[in-house]
Every structure is written in C-alpha cells, then in structure tokens.
From Swiss-Prot:
SUPFAM superfamilies reported in the protein's UniProt record: Ribosomal protein L13
Matching Pfam families: Ribosomal_L13 (PF00572)
UniProtKB keywords: Ribonucleoprotein, Ribosomal protein
Name of the protein: Large ribosomal subunit protein uL13
Keyword NAD applies: no
Record organism: Levilactobacillus brevis (strain ATCC 367 / BCRC 12310 / CIP 105137 / JCM 1170 / LMG 11437 / NCIMB 947 / NCTC 947) (Lactobacillus brevis)
Family that this chain belongs to: Belongs to the universal ribosomal protein uL13 family.
Name of the coding gene: rplM
MF annotations from Gene Ontology: mRNA binding; structural constituent of ribosome
InterPro entries hit by this protein: Ribosomal_uL13 (IPR005822), Ribosomal_uL13_bac-type (IPR005823), Ribosomal_uL13_sf (IPR036899)
Assembly and interaction partners: Part of the 50S ribosomal subunit.
Source organism superkingdom: Bacteria
GO cellular component, one term: cytosolic large ribosomal subunit
Cited PANTHER family: LARGE RIBOSOMAL SUBUNIT PROTEIN UL13M, RIBOSOMAL PROTEIN L13
GO BP terms, alphabetized: negative regulation of translation; translation
Length: 147
C-alpha cells in the first residue's frame, strides 16, 4: 500500500524567483505570488509545512489597479487611539508606499497563522527595478503565462 508523501522542513529545496509587476493587475499578481510562497507549484506541497520559495517583486510602483479602484477602493487602519480610524485610497496607497500595498495584498491570501507569517517573510518587494538579491541568482518568472 502506498502512503501519501509528507514533506519535512529539512527536505525543502528553496528557489528564488523574480517577478516584474509592471502593468500587472494587483490581485492577479498577489494570487500567483501567494501560491508560490505557499509552495503549491511543487509536487511536494504539504499544507502544514512551509514548502514555498522566495519571491522578489520589482517595479511595485507600476502595478495596475483596474477599473476605478485607484479612487474608489479604500484601505482602513486604526491607530489604537480614540478617533484614530485612518483611510486612504488605493491610488494614494500605491503612490505613497507601493511595497506595502503588494505585501498587504499577498498577506491577505496567505494562511492567518504562524505558518502564514513565516511564508510572508520570504516575500521581498521593491518599488523600482533595483534589488539586493543578485547573489541568490533569482530565476525570472513570467507572470503573464500563469494568470
């Protein structure tokens, strides 16, 4: 009788991928990146083990917001003080902090537990085309074929 393969944390082979976010829809980009961070693109995927790869997202400032999301979609956060509800539109969010916009979108698609937090640490987002991970020799991932 065959048994289901369960990956061990020591057996995981991690790769580095680089994704260009230029003119790619935010949600579609986030779903593909979250899938790679979870390791769902590998045959050794195990839900309770972090089998995912590292992902570098460049040109975050050029990510596309379709429709009227740039002006109508609102992101809220609370400071913790009375009357401290803050809001900003997706367009302002992209202009002020494009890295945080993509990180927030991807984290929303990862598990809401300690394993999801561990997966989110493997995401590296940069507003421009420059990044500091050349030594890892990242593999270019054409995201338009995966959407």
């Amino acid at each position: 009788m065959r048994t289901t393969y369960m990956a061990k944390p020591n057996d995981v082979d991690r790769k580095w991928y680089i994704v260009d976010a230029t003119d790619v829809s935010l949600g579609r980009l986030a779903s593909v990146v979250a899938s790679i961070l979870r390791g769902k693109n590998k045959p050794t995927f195990t839900p309770n083990v972090d089998t995912g790869d590292n992902v570098i997202v460049i040109n975050a400032e050029k990510v596309a917001l379709t429709g009227r999301k740039a002006s109508n979609k609102i992101y809220y956060h609370h400071t913790g003080f009375a009357g401290g509800l803050k809001s900003r539109t997706a367009g302002n969010f992209r202009d002020e902090n494009p890295e945080k916009l993509i990180e927030t979108s991807v984290q929303g698609m990862l598990p809401k537990n300690s394993l999801g937090h561990q997966m989110a640490l493997k995401l590296h987002v940069y507003a421009g085309a420059d990044h500091k991970h050349e030594a890892q020799k990242p593999e270019v991932l054409d995201i338009t074929n995966l959407i």
